[in-house]
């Protein structure tokens, strides 16, 4: 991983939520690095706010897909529950952390977001990289319908685009709006194509995917 602890208290703060025996996993806040543009910085703040919270199955109607969000860029798991539920799935192109978190939520456990635990982590993806990354996201949603099909994920993406647009207008960063539109378009197109990858030619799927090694016969057995 390319995440860097923001301070020396990362592990200590990541473990604090386990004082609640119902918490089965906890994940840290991600802060954009110095080379990030303001859109990436806003995205990190949107996905990783300063306020802590604990999610349970009761939050599904309100939070939707975000209930299952638990980025393993920097996360911890209660070992006995992790093993009891079988650990990370062995066959997935992407999203093993969210699939694990969904299993925990559905089993009645809770997921904690601990923003006091901080790591520096962000990426500057090109339009093509945004497309391929979200293609793989769509593939994972297709392959695990029991986890993802019952909850719409597009609404959260639309909310992010709207909030980012409002932010850019407020900051008078009008020249960045076309970039936001293009980035969002490539993300959405990639996701929708990945969601329907099984009706596409295999050679085309390989070209669209970021994680090309996943499509080797050995990895898919």
What are these regions (language model features)?
Residues 56-77, 93, 99, 141, ...:
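A recurrent flexible, glycine/aromatic-enriched loop bordering the glycosyltransferase active site
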Residues 156, 160, 190-221:
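Juxtamembrane C-terminal module of membrane proteins
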Residues 75-77, 81-86, 91-118:
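A short, conserved alpha-helix in the catalytic core of glycosyltransferases
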